[in-house]
Amino acid sequence: MKTVILSVNAGSSSVKLSAYTAEQGQSPIQIAEVQVSGLTAPPASLKYERGGKTIVKSREVDDQVSDQRDAFSLILKTLIEDDDLHDIQTKDDIGIICHRIVHGGDYTKPQLITNGTYHHLENLNDLAPLHNANSLPIVRLCVQDFPSARNVACFDSQFHSTIPEHIRTYPINQDIARRGRLRKYGFHGISYSFITRATAEFLGKDPSDVNIIALHLGSGASACAIKGGKSWDTSMGLTPLAGLPGATRSGSVDPSLVFHYASDVGKLSPASTKDLHISRAEEILNKQAGWKALTGTTDFRVIAAAATTTSSPTPSPNPNPNPNPDPNPDPNPDPQNQNHRLAFALLVDRISAFVGAYYVSLHGRVDALVFAGGIGERSAALRAAVVEQVGCLGFAADGDEDFDGDGGEGAVVVDVGREAAGGSDLGGRPRPRVLVCRTDEQFEMARMCAEDAEFWGSG
């Protein structure tokens, strides 16, 4: 029996919803997508697509739409009031609502949301105060207003439940660690689940036979070593702050840095509420760092353009420096361009370090290096710089400057490497591929729900 599945992805400044029809055990078919963005910088705007066709390109919405609950209510109203969207005419047409939850603690698979599940997610706010709080108000609204629908929590952390103990453990007192649930969890797991399946299909392999190094690069960025189709290691840790820098996140830094950065880091941030406790340290490293702190912008396109039109940010090591340097260097280089080059080079360095570490951790048995996420898909300059930096491991790009995420004729996975040129890696194995994957977290959540009999009332 066919039902409607809604996939809800609530961020700090936007709510995105994809609607699908599906039968149990079958692949979902997308019928609509709605996004409300700009919640933190009014006026917010709405974008609506139905059946792959743009219905509303961008429309400013009422000033009263100021938070995630308001945005979700507007999205639902948009769907129900569209007479041409025949599959959704009332709330009762919706069978399953799946919610992206960043931190799922020890959950290893999607969970049907009950009172017990919901209270457990509330308790996890202590571990992820800046992340889970965006999703829970919509979860609560859906549980109250959709009595005939099944609400399902899909966790960004669940994919990483396979990380071995020696990798996920922090070297601290283990009694305290167990009580406080202090260990590496990892995130972007819904995306990595999609990437693993899509890459395996592209390579003509079973997911259990695939070893890849995957990079989810967006305003939040992470890396993941995937061994036999399962997470082996990932750059994010207890929270999404660890690992790679992002638009406003520092990524991994010396843990004592923040205490030297400001004197009040242990105090609560003004952004805290009665139910949401955020320290100044968390606010500084999550909201006031990253490449925006270096350049003044969160737009990586601006950074990449400025960095790559001046000089290479990651020159290859040269044991014989140029004996004839420019006798007339620019005495007044543009400091803004210097900052952009610094941010670009810093990100390339951090990404390359994880690629190298994961290549070793996987014993050199790597089928592909996979770029995904908004920046991973669209920044040919970043891909080229990273691949050049890790070229000693056998990776090679094929000049994909024209691929900006919109090429590939709609393909989910595109080969941008030089596999066809032959060659081998350090171990004499065929050269690993360099791929771009258009990850789709909303689809992956809907697929998980469609395949699990429990969410259809038959498990």
UniProtKB/Swiss-Prot annotation:
Site positions (Transition state stabilizer): H188, R249
Keywords: ATP-binding, Kinase, Magnesium, Metal-binding, Nucleotide-binding, Transferase
Key word Transcription present: no
Binding residue positions for substrate: R100
Active-site residues per Swiss-Prot or TrEMBL entry: D156 (proton donor/acceptor)
Pathway listed: Metabolic intermediate biosynthesis; acetyl-CoA biosynthesis; acetyl-CoA from acetate: step 1/2
Catalysis performed (reactions): acetate + ATP = acetyl phosphate + ADP
Sequence ranges of Pro residues compositional bias: 314-334
Enzyme class: transferase
Alphabetical list of SUPFAM superfamilies matching this protein: Actin-like ATPase domain
Keyword Magnesium appears in the UniProt entry: yes
Positions with a binding annotation for Mg(2+): N9, E441
GO biological process, one term: acetate metabolic process
GO molecular function: acetate kinase activity; ATP binding; magnesium ion binding
Family to which this protein belongs: Belongs to the acetokinase family.
The protein, known as: Probable acetate kinase
Lineage: Eukaryota, Fungi, Dikarya, Ascomycota, Pezizomycotina
